[in-house]
Amino acid sequence: MYMSTSEIRAAFLEYFRSQGHQVVSSSSLVPHNDPTLLFTNAGMNQFKDVFLGADKRAYNRATTSQRCVRAGGKHNDLENVGYTARHHTFFEMLGNFSFGDYFKQDAIRFAWEFLTGTLKLPKERLLVTVYETDDEAFNIWANEVGVPVERIVRIGDNKGAAFASDNFWQMSDTGPCGPCTEIFYDHGDHIWGGPPGSPEEDGDRFIEIWNVVFMQFNRQADGTMEPLPRPSVDTGMGLERISAIMQGVHSNYEIDIFQALIKKAAEIVGTTDLSNQSLRVIADHIRSCAFLIADGVMPSNEGRGYVLRRIIRRAVRHGRKLGATDVFFYKLAAELAVQMKDVGAELIAQLPLVKRVLRIEEEQFVRTLDRGLLLLEDVLANLGDAKVIPGEVVFKLYDTYGFPADLTADVVREREIGIDEEGFNAEMEKQRARAKEASSFGVNYNEVLKLDFETPFTGYKQLSQKTSVVGIYKDGVEVNGLIAGEEAVVVLAETPFYAESGGQVGDCGVLKVDDGIFAVTDTQKAGKAIIHKGYLELGTLEKGALVEAVVDGERRQAVALNHSVTHLLHAALRQALGDHVTQKGSLVGAERMRFDFSHFEGLTMATIRRVEELVNAQIRANHDIATQVMDLEAAKSAGAMALFGEKYEDDVRVVRMGDYSTELCGGTHAKRTGDIGFFKIIAESGIAAGVRRIEAVTGKGAIDFMHQMGEQIEEAAALVKGDQFSIADKVRQILDKSKMMERELEQLKAKLAAQAGSDLLSQVIEINGQKVLIAALEGADPKSLRGMLDELKNRMKSGVVLLATSSDDKVNLIAGVTSDLTGKVKAGELVNLVAQQVGGKGGGRPDMAQAGGTQPEAVPAALQSVHSWLEERL
């Protein structure tokens, strides 16, 4: 019975709804509050806390069709996608779940009833496996369901340890775990392969379609298995696999959704070979890329963004392989939205963003793709009998041309060649070490000071307090005291000084003691201890001394204003650009602030102005800035934004600014948004692929900036003899005049070059009856060589021309051959002959070619060598 993919999905959810299950929407591909996961890769991910007992739901039975991505991390088999029948970066997992409700009997019954009743699969085509010692599951299959015992396979511990089996599931080394039973479909004896547990089990005849996990134990650290008080069920069935069976095909790429995408991709790139594996790659990759972007992931050079970038670039490379000459990948997103309309509401809503991001990413990559492929072809041509591309070459392709290592591997595998992964990783480590060395400044206090206590911070409510010195450190070594002029780090019993964190700079101020003053120039953290860096201005300071710690209040207030505005800016950027915007970093100082965020293109002036208006509107609204400490889950339920990658304690501080912004933040803030006064963006730039940076000023700093800009405009207006209202027109007039003069200058240079070319005709010689001109020109403009060459070829009618000019350490070469002689002499070969002798290389067409070099002193000998070379060819 044929069923479309959409019909199967709907039938699955409806069947389990009728069995009392709550139909739950697919969660985002970005896991919520689970830093252990790169992407959502299974249906149970969104219920993990429910299974662990940390979360409760209003239902105890659920069913989903979960979007999943498996690429990167331990699931990195990207190179196989498109080349096998069932490898994908994106797939849908159908699942039903019991949270302490039903267990083995009902779970097995539901699965069998759906497969044989709803889908009407032939029972004789189904085979099941159980864990070797799970007699309960075996008996349910044999005695209650009626599966013949010869079609029930017991699978033992086949992974080298107790309870390490294909049929024993565990969440991690400890915690919930249990046996599972799997259902396989037999595609028939015309396909090679054996049943699970046999030597031929890796064949394609028997395909797993449903895995039913019975969570019945809690694994302890010592390996003992304690029964769970409320056993649960977690199941998963790949939608693409069951669709292939229901549609009578063997490969997932032959099902309806993939065929529609493959046909559309073929139409876009202009190919008629629908069996080409590159079309499979593209059809798979548009699914993962589009849904990842719709769920807020942007291409970048790290983490999830880098996995997305790798997938996009692999798809682009396969498109070029098929003959695509223009950007194409983004055009497939609309067809995907049509095919996934039943479950793709997020994709449809974000379709304009998805297409824009894919187009921009492809445009950026194709600029270097062809050059990188040329380099790779060069390497392959000179590889000889070797079967591995050196790691240094793989790294150069990554570092210079943006080729992820697996993309290079994908290209060369077609020649049955591999890559040196160890060598590549070694080069990556060298680069990381260089970056770390280049960015290292000052002292890493976490490494130098091994402090094992926590300093209480009192600075939210006060800027000064009496406290005591519990430690003094000079150059990382603890000392008992200081004298005037000495630099050191001081640790207090408690402090009102804010230590740098969350992008906010550390406080400055003074520590006052009876006969001395310690100037605090910076405040940092060493572990959980707060340390005060500075120097003793006068007097002495000893360990144990009572001091008055006084924060520079004016500076703290300026920093607080700038910190508060980062929250408003974050919210405004998400409102103006979309929910994909997330904070990537910040620096909040007293004079200005900067804010790094995920976005794929530069902001237009109109967008910058809109963001400024949104922020300033919230400043004028004069919202109360309220802070509250609550537990992490309650904070997230209240809508507080958490930054991915940040580690949070169980209790967190929530900063709320009206209804506009709610974030988790430990920094200091203004009392009301109106205290900020005024917000002005002074710069916007890209700092990495997929990451933009805004620099801005607030309050008095913003007013000072506007005054400075006004003064500069007035000064510029005076220079062009205008005023602030006519300056743009005046500058435009000057630029137009400058362009006209540049054109006249180029025309004059061309005339002079033509004249010089005429003068060179007296140096023409004959080699084997053909005219040849070889000349070194002193002080000639390299830009004029092309015009000079054309003039000489026209005047000579037939012949070979080679011109060289040099200045400082640079050589410029150009060669020309008239069309009647290109069968004997190629300009590209001629210019390359000389270039190699002067420390360079070059190339071009048979009739004209250019090159460069770095050894002017070698030019005379190189030109002389041309005579004998031409004698052999003319």
Swiss-Prot record:
It holds the Pfam family tRNA_SAD. CDD domains: AlaRS_core. Keywords: Aminoacyl-tRNA synthetase, ATP-binding, Cytoplasm, Ligase, Metal-binding, Nucleotide-binding, Protein biosynthesis, RNA-binding, tRNA-binding, Zinc. The keyword ATP-binding applies. This is Alanine--tRNA ligase. SMART domains: tRNA_SAD (SM00863). The keyword Ligase applies. Its EC number is 6.1.1.7. The lineage of its organism: Bacteria, Pseudomonadati, Pseudomonadota, Gammaproteobacteria, Aeromonadales. Belongs to the class-II aminoacyl-tRNA synthetase family. PROSITE patterns: AA_TRNA_LIGASE_II_ALA. One of its GO terms (molecular function) is tRNA binding. GO terms for biological process: alanyl-tRNA aminoacylation; negative regulation of DNA-templated transcription. GO terms for cellular component: cytosol. HAMAP family: Ala_tRNA_synth_B. Gene3D superfamilies: 2.40.30.130, 3.10.310.40, 3.30.54.20, 6.10.250.550, Bira Bifunctional Protein, Domain 2 (3.30.930.10), Threonyl-trna Synthetase, Chain A, domain 2 (3.30.980.10).
